[in-house]
Amino acid sequence: MNTVSPAKKKVIIIGAGIAGLKAASTLHQNGIQDCLVLEARDRVGGRLQTVTGYQGRKYDIGASWHHDTLTNPLFLEEAQLSLNDGRTRFVFDDDNFIYIDEERGRVDHDKELLLEIVDNEMSKFAELEFHQHLGVSDCSFFQLVMKYLLQRRQFLTNDQIRYLPQLCRYLELWHGLDWKLLSAKDTYFGHQGRNAFALNYDSVVQRIAQSFPQNWLKLSCEVKSITREPSKNVTVNCEDGTVYNADYVIITVPQSVLNLSVQPEKNLRGRIEFQPPLKPVIQDAFDKIHFGALGKVIFEFEECCWSNESSKIVTLANSTNEFVEIVRNAENLDELDSMLEREDSQKHTSVTCWSQPLFFVNLSKSTGVASFMMLMQAPLTNHIESIREDKERLFSFFQPVLNKIMKCLDSEDVIDGMRPIENIANANKPVLRNIIVSNWTRDPYSRGAYSACFPGDDPVDMVVAMSNGQDSRIRFAGEHTIMDGAGCAYGAWESGRREATRISDLLK
């Protein structure tokens, strides 16, 4: 039996991601003393993580961009700091996309295909589908694209029917989900300005982490339970046996980890036991929101020997002329669905690098680094992260798509330079030196990337439940607790500031 008196704190913050760090920073700025940030990992930053690769190159293996830069307060703060000290903290890397098909090669800006124009119509079709009438049932993004093709086939060429669906799927790389898992209602969303590529997020994390007393931070400390006492205080129990008592608690763990608290299995890493349990409105909200698995693979080359025409390249999933025939011949949407299901069931092919779209950021153009940063979605992310240490297997999997990209960028096939082989005298040929893979689906304290919607989900329920808190003293912050900036670093940052400001006002 633990007879040690709990250490008393004003506010305890659980999680040292950007939401938790900003909450601590805001509390300190507002004059609140004696707070504590408990972090299960041995580092700060959460899903912001900068890693070092070949020749000391740095990459963000978690979030990479400041999105919505017209309205993003974290970006505007960074921009002001750059004005003050002249340091480059980001680059705007928006660009015209290069789209590559395995058979046809480049299909972007094609005078006959005009895929970008038809894709724009597809986004308008989605908007009209769900916003012209109230109560329209949700479906998967895949089903919505099929509906568009069926209704508009009279006005589409065979090649447009073949390639457009695969081009539309680049949106999978925003959400971290396959189009058959993704809510059609939630697929398209407005962007408030351009995207700025961070150089790098570790400087943002360290700046915020150093803006409050360092003795507030306790790393490698997993929280096991949170109990609301009759005295109105909150008791926090940690895995290492330490016990704390606080006036307020801000919980910033990811939605995927918080979800463990409503599962019957109690011995899961990261799971927090709540006493009393999370209130019904929070438990119910988990039924209306899910989690995506956006993963990253970094391909590091000796030097850049490819065209820097664009910083953005998407390779399209394979398509067939048989698909076009099915779309042309289907009597209605139900028949189209069943015909496509039948065709799928007859294919017993294993997953390849051409089974889904992939998004490559050509860092050579945007930052001068001879590397590609590739984004992938579930379920591919789960598979690739499970073999992340086997670099030869990774290279073998992605080699066909890398070679195709190099060909389209006026270069040669990729040479495997990861093994110490003598005499790689390959002037002006792309020599691959290293592969780095993210680990978010296998990390027990992230269990994926960020919140995402399956068909029928409604993220508003979770945001409302989280922003109202468990009660007046047990509060929540993180990207899943806010509407503006949901799924983004700045949304998490803003939610941490929101909760800390609220508590500061109550304590004054």
From Swiss-Prot:
Pfam families referenced in this protein's UniProt entry, alphabetically: Amino_oxidase
Top class in the EC scheme: oxidoreductase
GO molecular function: N(1)-acetylpolyamine oxidase (3-acetamidopropanal-forming) activity; N8-acetylspermidine:oxygen oxidoreductase (propane-1,3-diamine-forming) activity; oxidoreductase activity; polyamine oxidase activity; spermine oxidase activity
GO biological process: pantothenate biosynthetic process; spermine catabolic process
Keywords: FAD, Flavoprotein, Oxidoreductase
Enzyme Commission code(s) on record: 1.5.3.17
Cofactor(s), by name: FAD
A cellular component annotation (GO) from this entry: cytoplasm
UniProt-listed InterPro entries: Amino_oxidase (IPR002937), FAD/NAD-bd_sf (IPR036188), Flavin_monoamine_oxidase (IPR050281)
Catalytic activity line of the entry: spermine + O2 + H2O = 3-aminopropanal + spermidine + H2O2; spermidine + O2 + H2O = 3-aminopropanal + putrescine + H2O2; N(1)-acetylspermine + O2 + H2O = 3-acetamidopropanal + spermidine + H2O2; N(1)-acetylspermidine + O2 + H2O = 3-acetamidopropanal + putrescine + H2O2
Cofactor: how bound: Binds 1 FAD per subunit.
Role noted for this protein: Involved in the production of beta-alanine, a precursor of pantothenic acid. Multicopy suppressor of fenpropimorph resistance.
Protein family (similarity comment): Belongs to the flavin monoamine oxidase family.
Miscellaneous comment as given in the Swiss-Prot or TrEMBL entry: Present with 6960 molecules/cell in log phase SD medium.
Protein name: Polyamine oxidase FMS1
Organism name: Saccharomyces cerevisiae (strain ATCC 204508 / S288c) (Baker's yeast)
